[in-house]
Amino acid sequence: GEAVAIASDQVPELSGGEISKFFGQECLSMSLLWKLQNKTKAKVHSMVCIRGPKGNDFKLIFSPQLEMPHTIKEGVDTMNKELEKCIMLAPEQYAWEYKKYRRAGNEYHYNKRIL
């Protein structure tokens, strides 16, 4: 009866992730979820919290159990696709707290000074 919650949009250290697409753009994504599930055989679900129209009520939405693939790369791809689905339930509420695309060899778009 125990649970672990992982913020799957965090950017890992280079050794802790795989390059995967997120909204069509390559990024380094954590492999921790796949590694934990592969080791423990735990059930995996996504969860999203949607703020209600008045701003003082919230709805938690859990996905059906996710089938985790046999390889790390496929597991990371599955996690990113599921995260995209969660975000698209209310994209205006998603807070881009992490610089998701900074470690994938993409042009660096963060911390540029605006004149």
Short names for language-model regions:
Residues 1-115:
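Non-catalytic C-terminal accessory region of glycerolipid acyltransferases
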